[in-house]
Amino acid sequence: MSNTDDGFDKEAAREELREKYNADQQDREETARMSDLLLQGATMTNDHCDRCGTPLFRHDGETFCPTCQHDDNDDEPTATTQSAPDRSPPADPQATPHSSPPTTPDTSSSTAAATDDVPTAAARDRPEHAPTAEPTTPATEELESTIAALARRASDADDPRTAREYLEAAHEAAAALDTLRP
């Protein structure tokens, strides 16, 4: 019997499993980063990143997204710089992103170094969905956060029907967001 006789494509199923494994691997890496931050003394806040839906962390008075911050090392901007305009500038302007770890145990080189990159990366590369002149309101920020969370839940859903429901809800939230923006 060939793959087309019974309507089941083994290669497509394998590819789907590969994609799911890669997504699971990324989730494990994100979880490991968050665990490391907690062990280093960072605090997980009740807020979530507008871009990826990951919980925001606070360390040394700065709030950041561990996932987007990690992506910043790949020259991608974060949404947290736009959702927190009252953030103070980095405490140590001399720090570089690839510096060696400090000798004091109470500071985190990955947290401090990547946080120093945030304003530079955000100024250099703005995401398409975040215009520079538009002020954000709590309603738009909440809708953006909800859209990101719904999209993440849809990608994590095992049941296609559940994923479709999450995506429909995200679509409705996006339509509401479009009506709020001028």
UniProtKB/Swiss-Prot annotation:
Pfam families, per the entry: Auto_anti-p27
Basic and acidic residues bias (residue ranges): 7-33, 47-62, 153-162
Compositionally skewed regions (Low complexity) per UniProt: 105-122
Disulfide bond positions: none
Region described as Disordered: 1-162
InterPro entries given in the database record: SSSCA1, UPF0148, UPF0148_domain
Signal sequence coordinates: none
Family, per entry: Belongs to the UPF0148 family.
Protein name: UPF0148 protein VNG_2366C
